[in-house]
């Protein structure tokens, strides 16, 4: 029974030792110098927070041409950047240099370099090529002497060496052979001792008796970090410079205005952060292992995908080669046919010329015919022969080869193809689309339009994302509503919430993947549901002076000849007429919104609403007036009625003339341009591209807005005791265009439903 327990205890101890050994071996890569790939020896902390051995740093600076900036390796150190090398106690003690001589040595070694004069106005900045971050790090003028030693890293390296070394006990350096195992160390004496030797070399009552014993070690370090500038113990930490400083550094102008905290506070804060971070990592080991498995799977997928990409490229290039080979064969066949045709013609021409030689062919036959003495027979035979001889004579006099020997017409121009082949490269993802803000707007629905930048790779389809910005943010990442595989360069968002702000963005996709998102565009939706109506010119509209479009969404006032003829009857004044157009839909409840565009060249146009009964009563057969101050809105904007009347006005209009909006001096209740004591001072604002009218039937209020930015222009009270309809008044020439609902546009769009997939 006891043997079983002992075996179990031994097994657990061995398992613990194996785990410790494995952990230390896995940690070894953190203790290797990036230059020499060996354990750190007197590591220095670079400004980039990476570490490097002092000897390696000195060697690297020497290779870079910075001579004299690495310190004197034979001198005894007096700064954190240099420390005494391990010295055997049996060797004779080296004479320490005097402090003043050492100071001069350090200044000469660390403060000058070839090519610089002492006291130069612009000292050289030493750059150290950090092997870890692959960048140049500024060391300042002092070089390595301005760096701190990483004593903590030294201690970790020492503990690691002791843990992995088998039978590597540290021996007493003062014992006679054979030495005993050391039990103490002395940083002042820089030696290790057994118990007897420590008592012998630290006798009671002497100054050495005050030396504090440490654990035995082969590498002795300073007790603490010293300021490289003032040789004082560092006591504070500068958060701005992220550097340890002493009391003297703290009051220097270099750290003026910096956030400086005691080392104890910085120590506690960093220790707490490191402890929490380490605890989080240790508490999520399963997550780490899962991510490692995911990365390994990604590596395998990368290998497979890379091989597939290679095969695909090879197949495509082979396809190009096959097309080129087929084209080469067809071109060579065309050249061959042309060559044979030319050779045939030239051979026939040679045969004809050979027949002209003496005694052969045509010439020989002609010579024999000339021997004929019978005249009728000669005439019969010589007639046809003479024609052939005449043609041969003409060909002989105007000799020219029957075919050209040049094949210049068969030259290939492959410049464009060579350029295409040279520029042949992997397909890139589409660039970020550019949203067309001139065509993108929100009305009854949201219409989004975009385009790709010039020279952008094509996009097969797009992804449109949108969300409301005026809702409380939910914890976690921002959630977007998404519509994928959108064809074309426009999209339609149906049923948006009224009085909201939407942010939208687009990105393209092709075979190479998804591109970058476009810049976000913010759109304000109308404050109320959009009212759909058409223009009705049956009430108060003169067909001679008003022209309504076929779709009944636009109207133009044309004064024309009838107005001029009517004006001839008047001896004085300016003859004007008021024409009105109403909407064919009346509002009896709720809130409604619509928008229109007024021609900036209009003389005087009034846009607004009114009680349907009052509008028909006032404008049916409306008389011509002789004053431009005549106003049909029962007091609004004109001062025609007593302002003291408490009853709500039946009309509310916004006056537009010559590209300006005429407003009164009141605040939000700019219902008219006159006050109780007389005409009020009026002001004008520029006419926006579109005007919006929002009617709140229950509250009896109507608001006029800039339909682009939804900035309020005017708010008026209104009598809503009956049906209220839109109204447009014209004095002189002018034009109004109702904003067409997005859903009726003939342009091809992609509809995005109100319930889209969440990201």
From Swiss-Prot:
Q: Where are the zinc fingers (B box-type)?
A: 222-263
- Which sequence ranges does the entry mark as zinc finger (RING-type)? 33-59, 172-231
**Domain of life of the source:** Eukaryota
Spell out the molecular function terms from Gene Ontology.
zinc ion binding
Q: For the region Required for proximal axon localization, axon formation and migration, what residue ranges are annotated?
A: 1-166
- Indicate the segments forming the COS domain, all copies: 370-427
Recorded GO CC terms: axon cytoplasm; axon initial segment; cytoskeleton; main axon; proximal neuron projection
Q: How does it assemble?
A: Interacts with TUBB3 and TUBA4A.
Q: What is this protein called?
A: Tripartite motif-containing protein 46
């Amino acid at each position: 029974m006891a043997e079983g327990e002992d075996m179990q205890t031994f097994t657990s101890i061995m398992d613990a030792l194996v785990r410790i050994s494995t952990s230390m071996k896995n940690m070894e890569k953190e203790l290797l110098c990036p230059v020499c790939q060996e354990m750190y020896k007197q590591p220095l902390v670079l400004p980039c927070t990476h570490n490097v051995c002092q000897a390696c740093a000195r060697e690297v600076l020497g290779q870079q041409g910075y001579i004299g900036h690495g310190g004197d390796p034979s001198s005894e150190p007096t700064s954190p950047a240099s420390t005494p090398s391990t010295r055997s106690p049996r060797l004779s003690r080296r004479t320490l240099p005097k402090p003043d001589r050492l100071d001069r040595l350090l200044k000469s070694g660390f403060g000058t370099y070839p090519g610089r004069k002492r006291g130069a106005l612009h000292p050289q900045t030493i750059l150290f090529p950090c092997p870890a971050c692959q960048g140049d790090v500024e060391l300042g003028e002092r070089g390595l002497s301005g760096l701190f030693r990483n004593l903590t890293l030294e201690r970790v390296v020492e503990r690691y060496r002791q843990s992995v070394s088998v039978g590597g006990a540290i021996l007493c350096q003062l014992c006679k052979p054979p030495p005993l195992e050391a039990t103490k160390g002395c940083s002042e004496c820089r030696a290790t001792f057994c118990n007897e030797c420590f008592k012998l070399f630290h006798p009671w009552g002497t100054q050495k008796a005050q030396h504090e014993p440490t654990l035995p070690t082969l590498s002795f370090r300073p007790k603490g970090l010293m300021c490289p500038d003032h040789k004082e113990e560092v006591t504070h930490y500068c958060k701005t410079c992220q550097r340890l400083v002493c009391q003297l550094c703290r009051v220097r102008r270099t750290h003026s205005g910096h956030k400086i905290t005691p080392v104890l506070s910085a120590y506690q804060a960093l220790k707490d952060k490191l402890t929490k971070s380490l605890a989080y990592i240790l508490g999520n080991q399963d997550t780490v292992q899962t991510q490692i498995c995911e990365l390994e799977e990604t590596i395998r997928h990368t290998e497979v995908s890379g091989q597939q990409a290679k095969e695909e490229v090879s197949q495509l290039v082979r396809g190009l080669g096959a097309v080129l080979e087929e084209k080469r064969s067809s071109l060579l066949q065309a050249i061959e046919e042309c060559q044979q045709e030319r050779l045939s013609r030239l051979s026939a021409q040679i045969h004809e010329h050979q027949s002209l030689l003496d005694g052969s062919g045509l010439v020989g036959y002609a010579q024999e015919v000339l021997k004929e003495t019978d005249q009728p027979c000669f005439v019969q035979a010589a007639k046809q022969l003479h024609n052939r001889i005449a043609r041969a004579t003409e060909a002989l006099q105007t000799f020219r080869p029957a075919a050209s020997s040049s094949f210049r017409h068969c030259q290939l121009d492959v410049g464009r193809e060579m350029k295409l082949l040279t520029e042949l490269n992997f397909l890139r993802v589409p660039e970020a689309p550019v949203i067309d803000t001139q065509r993108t707007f929100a009305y009854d629905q949201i219409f989004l339009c975009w385009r790709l930048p010039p020279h952008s790779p094509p996009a097969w389809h797009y992804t449109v994302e949108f969300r409301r910005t005026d809702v409380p943010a939910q914890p976690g990442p921002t959630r977007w509503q998404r519509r994928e595989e959108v064809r074309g360069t426009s999209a339609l968002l149906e049923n948006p919430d009224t009085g909201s702000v939407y942010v939208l963005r687009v990105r393209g996709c092709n075979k190479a993947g998804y591109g970058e998102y476009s810049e976000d565009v913010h759109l304000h939706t109308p404050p109320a549901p959009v009212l759909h109506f058409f223009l009705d010119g049956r009430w108060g509209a003169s067909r001679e002076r008003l022209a309504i479009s076929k779709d009944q969404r636009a109207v133009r006032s044309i004064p024309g000849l009838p107005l001029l003829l009517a004006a001839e009857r008047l001896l004085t004044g300016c003859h004007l007429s008021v024409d009105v157009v109403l909407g064919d839909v009346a509002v009896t409840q709720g809130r409604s919104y619509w928008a229109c565009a007024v021609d900036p060249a209009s003389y005087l146009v009034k846009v607004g609403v009114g009680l349907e009964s009052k509008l028909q009563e006032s404008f049916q057969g409306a008389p011509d007036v002789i004053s431009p101050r005549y106003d049909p809105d029962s007091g609004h904007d004109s001062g025609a009625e007593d302002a003291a009347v408490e009853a709500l006005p039946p009309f509310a209009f916004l006056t537009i003339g010559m590209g300006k909006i005429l407003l009164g001096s009141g605040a939000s209740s700019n219902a008219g341009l006159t006050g109780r004591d007389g005409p009020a001072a009026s002001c004008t604002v520029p006419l926006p591209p579109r005007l919006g009218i929002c009617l709140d039937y229950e509250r009896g209020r109507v608001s006029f807005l800039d339909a682009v930015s939804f900035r309020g222009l005017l708010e008026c009270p209104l009598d809503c005791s009956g049906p209220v309809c839109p109204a447009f008044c014209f004095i002189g020439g002018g034009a109004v265009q109702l904003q067409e609902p997005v859903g009726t546009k003939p342009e091809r769009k992609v509809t995005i439903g109100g319930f889209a997939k969440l990201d």
